[in-house]
Amino acid sequence: MAEGDTGSDQRQNEEIEAMAAIYGEEWCVIDDCAKIFCIRISDDIDDPKWTLCLQVMLPNEYPGTAPPIYQLNAPWLKGQERADLSNSLEEIYIQNIGESILYLWVEKIRDVLIQKSQMTEPGPDVKKKTEEEDVECEDDLVLACQPENQVKTLDFDVSENRTEIEELPPIDHGIPITDRRSTFQAHLAPVVCPKQVKMVLAKLYENKKIASATHNIYAYRIYCEDKQTFLQDCEDDGETAAGGRLLHLMEILNVRDVMVVVSRWYGGVLLGPDRFKHINNCARNILVEKNYTNSPEESSKALGKNKKVRKDKKRSEH
């Protein structure tokens, strides 16, 4: 048994070294000890139209008797298209049992992306559909969690009369939380306009590890003195309801002029509701650390107020 494990380890290490040598910066180590890796695959390196992130975890039995545990991450990959690609990867494994297959998987995905780019253009319709689905999932939750003060939720493209500061704000990174091979890390930046939100996201995505996260959930709140209102918005990035929960936490803490992004790297084990606890704990910790929160008494009052709103909402639904 030990000899088999040693042989698997050696073959895995050789394959990992080969992948890093072949793909360079596209290949990303998420967790070396847990053997979780990620690679960003595009149809074209110079002018990518379609991109997909393949995340893999190598079990001890791979490549001898077990396949890699994998996840395909792309906002446009849904339904039959996702099923077809998954079937293709599983066929490759069946045809090459006992062999190292990561390279074959990557190149198969690249072939699919190239074919897709030749058949269609990634027009606004694809992106718009994804955004609308995300908004529909969150609308009820955000409305139920709104505090009594007037709040305005805006899309990035809406132009505001408020003077926009185009300087990239400083970004702080929180201490990661790891549970059952999933890792969560919060990132915080002061923001005073939606354009800065976009700048912060762009800067974070320059980091290949953050860009390859399974989910990058974020929320922001900007206070407009002249209108006595908040501009606020949130994004699930595929983790349903996580953005709304994060925004609700920021409302409870009564923070303003700040955005929080929480990156999650999925480790292959489902966490259930615990994932929301870790997302909010990451966010709360960095908000407290950077002195964005009110006193505990004020936060408790706000929490009570929000609970009352949610309870009234629930009663009306039943």
Swiss-Prot record:
SUPFAM superfamilies hit by this protein: Ribosomal protein S5 domain 2-like (SSF54211), UBC-like (SSF54495)
SMART domains: RWD
Broad class of the protein's primary localization: cytoplasm
Localization: Cytoplasm
Gene Ontology biological process terms in this record: cellular response to amino acid starvation; GCN2-mediated signaling; intracellular signal transduction; negative regulation of transcription by RNA polymerase II; neuron projection extension; positive regulation of neuron differentiation; regulation of cytoplasmic translational initiation in response to stress; regulation of translational initiation
Location of the region described as Disordered in the Swiss-Prot/TrEMBL record: 294-318
GO molecular function terms listed in the Swiss-Prot or TrEMBL record: actin binding; protein sequestering activity
Name of a matching Pfam family: UPF0029
Biased composition (Basic residues): 304-318
Keyword Cytoplasm attached: yes
Keyword check for Repressor: yes
Modified residues (Phosphoserine): 295
Residue stretches making up the RWD domain: 14-116
PROSITE patterns: RWD, UPF0029
Role description: Translational regulator that ensures constant high levels of translation upon a variety of stress conditions, such as amino acid starvation, UV-C irradiation, proteasome inhibitor treatment and glucose deprivation. Plays a role as a negative regulator of the EIF2AK4/GCN2 kinase activity; impairs GCN1-mediated EIF2AK4/GCN2 activation, and hence EIF2AK4/GCN2-mediated eIF-2-alpha phosphorylation and subsequent down-regulation of protein synthesis.
Complexes and interactors: Interacts with GCN1; prevents the interaction of GCN1 with EIF2AK4/GCN2 and inhibits EIF2AK4/GCN2 kinase activity. Interaction with RPL39; this interaction occurs in a GCN1-independent manner. Associates with ribosomes; this interaction occurs in a GCN1-independent manner. Associates with actin; this interaction occurs in a GCN1-independent manner.
Protein name: Protein IMPACT
Species per Swiss-Prot/TrEMBL record: Bos taurus
Gene (UniProt): IMPACT
